[in-house]
Curated annotation (Swiss-Prot):
Name of the featured protein: Solute carrier family 2, facilitated glucose transporter member 1
Record topology, Extracellular segments: 34-66, 113-120, 177-185, 294-306, 356-365, 423-429
Lineage: Eukaryota, Metazoa, Chordata, Craniata, Vertebrata
Binding site for D-glucose: Q161, Q282, Q283, N288, N317, E380, W388
Modified residues (N-acetylmethionine): M1
Modified residues (Phosphoserine): S226, S465, S490
Length: 492
């Protein structure tokens, strides 16, 4: 099949931009809790004194703070696993629109928690916005993938990750003590999430529903055709419609796909395994360990103003996501993911050497900063953006919601595990903690090389057909036959 149009219309960018506001929320709420830790802990202490007339015990304070951080991921797990309940019933766009109610409720709870002298409100607000973000990590890549032409699906899919990293960077800047990360303004820092939620409520009603959802799920061909014409800026959308109809016919021949069926069926087992491992490669790469504890890592490295070095890593994060956006359709998803994993492994080794020799060689602090920035840069080349949207590419319309739910749940669960365990593992292993991530990165590289297909330039149905046709005879084929960049349909 010839590559589809690369024309970027205003309607397409409005749709993608409106959706990506949810990605920005995810990034912001991931990064916002770190900077104001000390002032929020003091709020917990003052609240405890107000209630019980004594200072809070250090162990209780640590537990409350850990809960405040971790409850976000628990909410994310629940939200990500619930994606399929909404998108098939209400549609992709309407699901994103409805979920902003959760963002408004969370903003109110966290914004008024200090006034109400209730740390329970803050923790509940973190849980609710976690549910919102878990749903968003499923809704946004699915919607963007379904409204984008095949030739632009990778580049536009990368915008989800760009939204996340911009959100993290905004949170890092707003969290500075001189802006909102102080005793007076931290409630506003946490509740400012109502702004992108309000903006999304204004923009999304102007955006179309996914044409794939309209045609394949609702059988509304005329509406789907009208939406496609607006998105493509072209009166002739026959090829897009034919591709969707073929996928619809294939879907009708299959029974409804449940989460269990994804693992039972030979046609889905390999793609769901690839989807889960790709998500694990994102979270177990060590990137969140760098983000969660970057300030303390920079302090150990001898940086005088570690908070600004952390913001510097956020800028690198954003810059290289933009780089990925421009090269993903040329280099391909699989190639960029492999480059990213290899680069991160090399930087993790450098980071380990620098931190281990820091006391003997003070100049190693500069090497550790270079290693951290390099680690972040390589992450955004591949493992950052690609797992989000390639999951939607690996599945046809029928199993896609269930697959996105499973992959998202895997992502959030591994995120939670790293967030809870890294501090203890770091205390146990010292500067050698990143050796663990190096080993994991090498394993993910091997899996990606042998098991993950290239999806660049291929329609959803072509990719799904590759898994259906090649499932029985994979082991007889060489990696070159399986993963040639132009890809036969027997790829797995």
């Amino acid at each position: 099949m010839e590559p589809s149009s690369k024309k970027v219309t205003g309607r397409l960018m409005l749709a993608v931009g409106g959706a990506v506001l949810g990605s920005l929320q995810f990034g912001y709420n991931t990064g916002v809790i770190n900077a104001p830790q000390k002032v929020i802990e003091e709020f917990y202490n003052q609240t405890w004194i107000h209630r019980y007339g004594e200072r809070i015990l250090p162990t209780t304070l640590t537990t409350l703070w850990s809960l405040s951080v971790a409850i976000f991921s628990v909410g994310g797990m629940i939200g990500s696993f619930s994606v399929g309940l909404f998108v098939n019933r209400f549609g992709r766009r309407n699901s994103m629109l409805m979920m902003n109610l959760l963002a408004f409720v969370s903003a109110v709870l966290m914004g008024f928690s200090k006034l109400a002298k209730s740390f329970e409100m803050l923790i509940l607000g973190r849980f609710i916005i976690g549910v919102y973000c878990g749903l968003t990590t499923g809704f946004v890549p699915m919607y963007v993938g379904e409204v984008s032409p095949t030739a632009l699906r990778g580049a536009l899919g990368t915008l989800h990750q760009l939204g996340i990293v911009v959100g993290i960077l905004i949170a890092q800047v707003f969290g500075l003590d001189s802006i909102m990360g102080n005793e007076d303004l931290w409630p506003l820092l946490l509740s400012v999430i109502f702004v992108p939620a309000l903006l999304q409520c204004i923009v999304l009603p102007l955006c179309p529903e996914s044409p794939r959802f309209l045609l394949i799920n609702r059988n509304e061909e005329n509406r789907a055709k009208s939406v496609l014409k607006k998105l493509r800026g072209n009166a002739d959308v026959t090829r897009d419609l034919q591709e969707m109809k073929e996928e619809s016919r294939q879907m009708m021949r299959e029974k409804k796909v449940t989460i269990l069926e994804l693992f039972r069926s030979p046609a889905y087992r390999q793609p769901i395994l690839s989807a889960v491992v790709l998500q694990l490669s994102q979270q177990l790469s060590g990137i969140n360990a760098v983000f969660y504890y970057s300030t303390s890592i920079f302090e150990k490295a001898g940086v005088q103003q570690p908070v600004y070095a952390t913001i510097g890593s956020g800028i690198v994060n954003t810059a290289f996501t933009v780089v990925s956006l421009f090269v993903v359709e040329r280099a391909g998803r699989r190639t960029l993911h492999l480059i990213g994993l290899a680069g991160m492994a090399a930087c993790a080794v450098l980071m380990t050497i620098a931190l281990a020799l820091l006391e003997q060689l003070p100049w190693m602090s500069y090497l550790s900063i270079v290693a951290i920035f390099g680690f972040v840069a390589f992450f955004e080349v591949g493992p950052g953006p690609i797992p989000w949207f390639i999951v939607a590419e690996l599945f046809s319309q029928g199993p896609r919601p269930a697959a996105v739910a499973v992959a998202g749940f895997s992502n959030w669960t591994s995120n939670f595990i790293v967030g809870m365990c890294f501090q203890y593992v770091e205390q146990l292993c010292g500067p050698y903690v990143f050796i663990i991530f190096t080993v994991l990165l090498v394993l993910f590289f091997i899996f990606t090389y042998f098991k993950v297909p290239e999806t660049k330039g291929r329609t959803f149905d072509e990719i799904a057909s590759g898994f259906r046709q090649g499932g029985a005879s994979q082991s007889d084929k060489t990696p070159e036959e399986l993963f040639h960049p132009l890809g036969a349909d027997s790829q797995v």
